[in-house]
């Protein structure tokens, strides 16, 4: 804000946007409007407030672009309050789930994952509280400096107003006295007199020391307890309610304070997203992959997932199209919607083509998606190969009984992994008059060997060797039995590598 040499008060466009909060105590002197008076729209210039005249921000003189908001824009609705409550619920759920996950890792004695998870939680929370407290210090000190500057500029303000009044009289003599300008001059003189008598009169005492101490102490405790963001949400709701219950002259002050407070808390939430949520998501994905807890996605679940993604894209696109600015988006609105949905459809088509024609293990439709999708129920029926075909290369493994027993004892203590190949022991024959029927040992193979790297294939081969040596002392050679028809093609590979 600056004053000309002849005493005319000038304000730039950049001063208008922050006027409601910078001089919230003197709404009449800032806006240059009498309560209920209409802004003067005669003439255009460089958007200066000369002699207290009020000009519209857009330069066109329309009521929707003036500094004083319309009644609909100033009204704080219930939906605004519900959105803030939803934001609080999301924030609490986010932090609570992270803390619960850290405690779960600690109870499972995964101290490395516990430390990393808790580190990202603490890093994001402390960063957000630091920014929030820094903004509080800046706002509180700005209010104190503004009051001190206002107390020290009483005499300068009186001189400025007297110069403006004299210049207004001269202006009224030089310009034609149209009815609109006469009304504007009268309104300007009334506003100037009321401002000189009330706005620039003796101000009240400064803030007491105990009040400043209480504010600083309470804000420090709130931010130490990591509740600064929650406090700002609650303060935003309080300012919104005050903007509805206050008088007409004070309503715009609370409304603008609520808008600025909500902008601050939204920026804090954005910082928390980048500093805590995004690293936490990457960390948990790495933990899932390294601990082999990632389960295969079934076809029905995959269909439901992409259906939800399509519904979400459609809802957001529809909301954007309905509430967009027509003048700025008419040129690309429809092409943008076409690109969004065509890209989604193209991705789904390519995914289906990959699983239908280009998957390394053949078409995936109609069979299990991966080895984890196989039915591991031990009561399931197994497809049995002919005995003479499946055991041709295994007959040479028989030898002396003593040697086999010694080898079986040697291999039974090795490779303490879970049994991949289930061995069905020989059923003892019951005494009868007829000759006993020899029961053969069957080795059931449940996993596809080609789906594993070379090292894991070697581990599987050692497991099947252990199973064969453990039952090689039987009278009949063991027989391989496969659970899935897709595994039949690996029979020769098993038999040639053992």
Swiss-Prot record:
Membrane topology, record value: Multi-pass membrane protein
Presence of the UniProt keyword Repeat in the record: no
InterPro entries for the chain: XK-rel (IPR018629), XK-related_scramblase (IPR050895)
GO biological process, one term: apoptotic process involved in development
Region ranges (Disordered): 24-46, 166-203
Biased composition (Low complexity): 183-198
UniProt entry keywords in alphabetical sequence: Cell membrane, Membrane, Transmembrane, Transmembrane helix
Protein's cellular compartments: Cell membrane
Family: Belongs to the XK family.
Protein name: XK-related protein 4
Gene it is expressed from: xkr4
């Amino acid at each position: 804000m600056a004053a000309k040499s002849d005493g005319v008060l000038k304000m730039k466009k950049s001063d208008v946007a922050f006027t409601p909060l910078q001089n919230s105590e003197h709404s009449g002197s800032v806006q240059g409007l009498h309560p209920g008076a209409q802004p003067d729209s005669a003439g255009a210039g460089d958007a200066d407030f000369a002699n207290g005249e009020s000009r519209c921000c857009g330069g066109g003189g329309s009521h929707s672009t003036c500094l004083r908001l319309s009644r609909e824009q100033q009204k704080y609705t219930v939906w605004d309050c519900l959105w803030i409550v939803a934001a609080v619920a999301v924030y609490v759920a986010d932090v609570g789930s992270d803390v619960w996950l850290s405690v779960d890792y600690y109870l499972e004695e995964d101290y490395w994952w516990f430390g990393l998870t808790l580190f990202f939680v603490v890093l994001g929370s402390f960063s957000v509280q630091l920014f929030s407290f820094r903004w509080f210090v800046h706002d509180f000190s700005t209010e104190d400096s503004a009051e001190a500057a206002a107390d020290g500029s009483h005499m300068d303000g009186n001189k400025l107003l007297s110069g403006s009044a004299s210049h207004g009289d001269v202006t009224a003599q030089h310009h034609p006295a149209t009815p609109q300008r006469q009304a504007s001059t009268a309104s300007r003189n009334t506003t100037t007199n009321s401002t000189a008598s009330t706005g620039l009169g003796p101000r009240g005492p400064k803030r007491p020391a105990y009040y400043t101490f209480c504010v600083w102490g309470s804000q420090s405790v709130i931010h130490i307890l990591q509740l600064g963001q929650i406090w700002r949400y609650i303060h935003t709701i309080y300012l919104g309610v005050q903007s509805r219950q206050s008088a007409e002259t004070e309503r715009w002050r609370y409304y603008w304070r609520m808008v600025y407070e909500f902008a601050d808390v939204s920026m804090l939430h954005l910082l928390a997203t980048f500093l805590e949520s995004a690293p936490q998501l990457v960390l948990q994905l790495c933990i899932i992959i390294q601990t082999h807890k990632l389960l295969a996605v079934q076809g029905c679940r995959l269909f439901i997932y992409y259906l939800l993604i399509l519904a979400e894209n459609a809802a957001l696109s529809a909301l954007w199209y309905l509430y967009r600015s027509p003048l700025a988006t008419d040129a690309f609105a429809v092409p943008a919607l076409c690109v969004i949905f065509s890209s989604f459809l193209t991705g789904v088509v390519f995914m289906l083509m990959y699983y239908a024609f280009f998957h390394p293990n053949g078409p995936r439709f109609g069979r299990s998606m991966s080895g984890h999708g196989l039915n591991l129920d031990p009561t399931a029926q197994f497809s049995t190969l002919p005995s003479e075909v499946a055991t041709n290369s295994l007959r040479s493994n028989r030898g002396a009984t003593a040697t086999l027993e010694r080898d079986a004892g040697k291999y039974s203590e090795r490779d303490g992994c879970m049994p991949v190949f289930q061995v069905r022991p020989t059923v003892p024959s019951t005494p009868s008059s007829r000759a006993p029927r020899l029961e053969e040992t069957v080795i059931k193979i449940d996993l596809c060997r080609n789906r594993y790297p070379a090292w894991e294939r070697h581990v599987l081969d050692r497991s099947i060797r252990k199973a064969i040596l453990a039952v090689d002392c039987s009278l009949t050679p063991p027989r391989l039995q496969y659970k899935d028809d897709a595994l039949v093609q690996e029979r020769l590979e098993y038999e040639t590598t053992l």
